[in-house]
């Protein structure tokens, strides 16, 4: 098949018109990086750039857990925290392109991303134990009943429920789709998170809203990025 272009789902926030990564909390060397220009000049093909959460949820809207639904809030739980709003299979970017950038919202002593992300769960465990280990190791310990790992996941769960409730009370979507690498540990936090989340939102919303894991799993971002070439 002929290659017609390259779609990219990048960490953000971005200036999509200029093709620049504006800021990156977890990868500071990418601040103001001209990604669009670099890729286009390297490959000589048209490039469409969007943030990774938007790309992932566009994929889910077209082929995954949001298929046949009209209003979607997507959350990505990876190294950082991302969110996306897709309505009628179109990404809602807002006036400046920053719609869904909930990661820097204030929470306790820092930002919500400091608590709700792969980095966040490691930070929470380190605060309790003074030991720095990976999220995968913390999940393993939690499944074995380790009290400190379970405490860290409990705080993560509370923070995630808060973050979802803030956003859902504003956007009122049909479905919340959650994806990203942290979802490999969803058996630890999912049921508790859903229960807490529904306490913090409007009763009418709680009665009808769906919460789903990403249906395309790790393929959602790739598929959504490719779709940018012909949907957007």
Q: Would you name each region that the model predicts?
A:
Residues 52, 78, 225:
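Active-site glycine-centered loops adjacent to acidic/histidine catalytic or metal-binding residues
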Residues 3-7, 48, 72-76, 82-84:
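Short glycine-aspartate micro-motif
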């Amino acid at each position: 098949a002929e290659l017609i272009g390259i779609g990219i789902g990048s960490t953000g926030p971005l200036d999509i018109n200029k093709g620049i990564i504006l800021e990156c909390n977890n990868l500071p060397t990418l601040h103001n990086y001209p990604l669009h220009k670099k890729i286009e000049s390297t490959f000589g093909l048209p490039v469409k750039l969007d943030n990774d959460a938007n790309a992932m949820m566009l994929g889910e809207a077209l082929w995954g857990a949001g298929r046949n639904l009209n209003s979607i809030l997507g959350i990505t739980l990876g190294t950082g925290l991302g969110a996306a709003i897709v309505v009628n299979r179109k990404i809602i970017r807002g006036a400046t392109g920053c719609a869904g950038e909930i990661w820097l919202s204030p929470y306790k002593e820092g930002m919500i991303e400091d608590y709700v992300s792969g980095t966040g769960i490691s930070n929470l465990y380190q605060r309790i134990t003074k030991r720095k280990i990976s999220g995968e190791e913390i999940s393993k310990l939690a499944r074995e009943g380790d009290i400190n790992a379970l405490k860290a996941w409990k705080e993560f769960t509370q923070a995630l429920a808060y973050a979802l409730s803030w956003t859902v009370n504003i956007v009122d979507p049909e479905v919340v789709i959650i994806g990203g690498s942290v979802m490999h540990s969803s058996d630890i936090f999912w049921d508790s998170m859903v229960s807490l989340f529904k306490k913090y939102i409007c009763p009418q919303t709680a009665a009808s809203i769906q919460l789903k894991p990403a249906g395309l799993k790790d393929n959602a971002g790739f598929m959504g990025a490719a779709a940018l070439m012909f949907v957007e």
